[in-house]
């Protein structure tokens, strides 16, 4: 457990690079991946079911040792699943059309959830990949829980939230996406996991671009699993969420590439990998795992 936490702490720093993290990353690769390496063909999809401290680790960041050390994401598409039961029950991934439901840039009434500087930019970067007639966009005051719950959810193949998230470590059903308030009620701005599972969806991909704090976006692993589980139970084929703080600057770029790749026909798991690799192969600071590794996809087979 100590090596996982130490490695994660290294990755959480914006300056955490391959050079500064290779020792622990390679040790974890030898421990967790190498024993099964013969069973993993190059370029294959690898599904990870992790628990405990390992659920906080993005396996894509493990370092493949050798003459040219590199992150495992270079060799394989890494997918996560909350449980064997959910993995077995996963529906085949189909295209299912190009309709988008997008909610974000909510109005803040709580200082714990300040407004997000880059939310509007991220939303515009997503909108442009869909025909106007095929998208429903709820922003500012209209980005509220009722707008989601009252939508004809089953018609949307893509659902995307640009909002704060709050995790409940005691009850995953209390995890919530923070939107605009609909009334003076204390929690009218929260879209709870317990409500999400009561409203069936057929989305090919749900993306929870959850944010927390001024200029950073984060989501505790337990809460990510709670919300991912809720959307999967509701009928989503794949869910993308963030494991830790990410830069408010790099996320719009990553999402732009993700949706461009989806538009070009890549399946969600491949599209996310390609978006991450675009940052990893860039020349600036965005190549560090802090910027591309937080986002994880669940059940994208």
What are these regions (language model features)?
Residues 42-45, 98, 132-133, 154-158, ...:
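Loop/turn elements at helix/coil->beta-strand transitions in domains of secreted/extracellular proteins
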Residues 46-48, 103, 126, 159, ...:
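Residue-level detector of buried hydrophobic side-chain packing
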Residues 250-301:
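An often Trp-containing, charged/polar helix-loop segment at the C-terminal end
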Residues 84, 90, 157-257:
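Catalytic cores of nucleophile-dependent amide-cleaving enzymes
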Residues 18, 22-23, 110, 115-174, ...:
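Functional beta-strand-loop-alpha-helix junction segments that form "active/interaction loops"
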Residues 49-52, 103-107, 141, 161-165, ...:
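Active-site-proximal beta-strand/loop segments in catalytic clefts of secreted hydrolases
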């Amino acid at each position: 457990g100590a090596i996982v936490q130490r490695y994660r702490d290294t990755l959480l720093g914006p300056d955490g690079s391959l050079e500064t993290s290779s020792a622990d990353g390679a040790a974890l690769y030898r421990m967790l991946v190498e024993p099964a390496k013969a069973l993993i063909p190059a370029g294959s999809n690898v599904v990870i079911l992790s628990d405990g401290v390992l659920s906080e680790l993005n396996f894509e960041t493990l370092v493949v040792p050798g003459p040219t050390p590199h992150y495992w994401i270079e060799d394989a598409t890494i997918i996560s699943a909350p449980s064997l039961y959910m993995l077995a029950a996963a529906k085949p991934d189909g295209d299912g059309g190009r309709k988008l439901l997008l909610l974000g840039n909510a109005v803040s009434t709580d200082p714990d959830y300040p407004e997000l500087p880059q939310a509007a930019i991220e939303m515009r970067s997503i909108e442009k990949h869909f025909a106007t007639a095929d998208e429903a966009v709820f922003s500012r005051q209209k980005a509220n829980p009722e707008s989601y719950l009252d939508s004809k959810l089953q018609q949307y193949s893509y659902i995307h939230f640009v909002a704060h998230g709050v995790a409940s470590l005691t009850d995953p059903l209390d995890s919530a996406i923070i939107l605009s308030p609909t009334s003076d009620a204390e929690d009218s701005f929260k879209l709870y996991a317990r409500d999400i599972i009561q409203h069936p969806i057929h989305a090919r991909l749900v993306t929870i671009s959850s944010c927390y704090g001024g200029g950073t976006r984060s989501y505790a692993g337990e809460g990510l699993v709670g919300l991912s589980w809720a959307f999967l139970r509701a009928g989503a084929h794949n869910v993308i969420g963030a494991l830790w703080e990410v830069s408010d600057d790099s996320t719009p770029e990553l999402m732009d590439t993700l949706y461009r790749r989806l538009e070009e026909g890549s399946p969600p798991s491949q599209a996310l990998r390609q978006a991450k690799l675009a940052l990893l192969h860039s020349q600036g600071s965005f190549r560090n795992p802090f910027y591309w590794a937080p986002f994880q996809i669940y059940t994208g087979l």
